[in-house]
Amino acid sequence: MKQGKTLETLGAELQRQRAARQDFVADTRHLNFYTEDGKSRLTLTTGNKLLEFGVNPLAHQQISARLGIPLKYYQRMQTEAPALLDENVNNWLQQSPERRMLRVMDGNVRAFLSDRYRRLDNLELCAAVLPIIQGMKGAVIESCEVTEAHLYLKVINRKMKAEVAVNDACVII
């Protein structure tokens, strides 16, 4: 892993993300997918409000998988026939109604998940894991990073490094 953020900058980013995130559980019949200026958009009708979001690459993959549209074909429609993609996605959203959770960050759908998905954010995860890491003798958080899809913590346990020598047989259980 490349050198990433310090724990302090990671904490600040996770706080920012917590304030910027939104989760919506919606019936797929209240969703509309369209392309504008080469960018995919997803609208959600809630009561008398119309919410509009961009769609990030991971959400595209999840939409493709959930609707049973092969990813290569989905991506080809994105670039070569966006109107066809819009029609396909909207057709399957209407024809196969179900409740889905939309995870939104900074105005973009970043995940298209089951409505039963446990809502756990990176800040909660760090709050649970960091005390355990800090309690490990010799453990040092070397680097951390957060992306749209992943949280990375590089932890080096200097005590273990001193006990395990090169060419020692190790078994991971």
Question: What residue ranges belong to the model's regions?
Answer:
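Feature for intrinsically disordered/low-complexity regulatory segments and propeptides
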Residues: M1-A128
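Intrinsic disorder/low-complexity polar-acidic segments
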Residues: R119-I173
